[in-house]
Amino acid sequence: MEHAATTGPRPGPPSRRVENVVLRAKDWLPGAPGGTAVWATSLEAEVPPDLALNKEQQLQISKELVDIQITTHHLHEQHEAEIFQLKSEILRLESRVLELELRGDGTSQGCAVPVESDPRHPRAAAQELRHKAQVPGHSDDHRFQVQPKNTMNPENEQHRLGSGLQGEVKWALEHQEARQQALVTRVATLGRQLQGAREEARAAGQRLATQAVVLCSCQGQLRQAEAENARLQLQLKKLKDEYVLRLQHCAWQAVEHADGAGQAPATTALRTFLEATLEDIRAAHRSREQQLARAARSYHKRLVDLSRRHEELLVAYRAPGNPQAIFDIASLDLEPLPVPLVTDFSHREDQHGGPGALLSSPKKRPGGASQGGTSEPQGLDAASWAQIHQKLRDFSRSTQSWNGSGHSCWSGPRWLKSNFLSYRSTWTSTWAGTSTKS
């Protein structure tokens, strides 16, 4: 601490105020013999020599004490100034209240005399006393003449004040009743409007509930229809697969039987015809599966659109105010989309000009030779044709029995079935002709 005091800037000489404070402190405290204060002698006696304060520290402490006293003095002055301001404000308000009371009394009396002329006013009373003091020879007759007037004024003033107050109270009551009646009318109007709004909201909620029930039922029916459609598609696919397998089996048996007969050209023609027929059937099946897939996608898209519309309706009816959207059951297009039954066979029919052109038009092979399935393949013996005819007859009977049980194995166009039956009848007639010739 001493090091800091020696190295720091040396303070200047103490001001006169500090010296006065120090002198006053010395005057207040009793001194010891020799001119030193008691607290100084006791401090010197108690504090060791190495802890004794130097003059700079003493001056610093004295300066801080003086600053504290100055701050306290400023605060005291500020407090007194605020008290004076508050008192002056109170006096001003009291004078204003008194002036307003006097003005109200003067207005109720209906006289336009100044406030100082009022005998109740302190200034008027003081002037009257001063006038009486200046005129000591004031006659008693004049005093008696003035006294009845002064004695009658308070009664008239009280009567006028009472009548004025009654009029004001009556006007205030009438005004209050008129305002209350207007408020009652306004409240009744608002109540009717609120009741109408509640009824409209209730009706809208009922309509929304009814439409939601209808929408849910339609969605349920749509889901049931989709489930039934999926089930029927699976069943149809299974039947088609079974039909294709049986047809392939019969065709390969016919080809093997023809190969066993040893007629090479006729066997090649029959094989080509059967392979072309199977390929057309496979193409028809693929086209039908693609159509069913497109129909399923369209149904799914419609379901998503319907769900979105349902959500929009719910949001529109839940929002405050009038609904922006109107739910119309007639606008729902819940009828199934028409699935086209056009297959590759119909396209070929349009291109070649007729149902029989598919079988009658020859196919160009890569080798350049035209090999086509003719309507009357020649060159087979009677035994081969008899076996082929028997196989086809068995297949036809099994197909008829399957159709009779409520199923339909033929999913292609009708003209292909008629051509197949006509081709079978042609084989039968050819076999009958060859058998008679033999």
From Swiss-Prot:
Example of a GO cellular component annotation carried by this entry: centriole
Keyword Repressor: no
Cell compartments where the protein resides: Cytoplasm, Cytoskeleton, Microtubule organizing center, Centrosome, Centriole; Cytoplasm, Perinuclear region; Cell membrane, Sarcolemma; Sarcoplasmic reticulum
Any Pfam family matching the protein: DUF4472
Keyword Phosphoprotein: no
Keywords: Cell membrane, Cilium biogenesis/degradation, Coiled coil, Cytoplasm, Cytoskeleton, Membrane, Sarcoplasmic reticulum
Main location (coarse class): cytoplasm
Tissue specificity as recorded in UniProt: Expressed primarily in skeletal muscle.
Superkingdom of the source species: Eukaryota
Coiled-coil regions listed in the entry: 74-105, 217-246
A GO biological process held by the record: cell projection organization
Region annotation (Disordered) ranges: 345-381
Function noted in UniProt: Component of the deuterosome, a structure that promotes de novo centriole amplification in multiciliated cells that can generate more than 100 centrioles. Deuterosome-mediated centriole amplification occurs in terminally differentiated multiciliated cells (G1/0) and not in S phase. Essential for centriole amplification and is required for CEP152 localization to the deuterosome.
Disease: Myopathy, centronuclear, 4: A congenital muscle disorder characterized by progressive muscular weakness and wasting involving mainly limb girdle, trunk, and neck muscles. It may also affect distal muscles. Weakness may be present during childhood or adolescence or may not become evident until the third decade of life. Ptosis is a frequent clinical feature.
Family from the record: Belongs to the CCDC78 family.
Name this polypeptide is given: Coiled-coil domain-containing protein 78
Organism encoding this protein: Homo sapiens
Gene designation: CCDC78
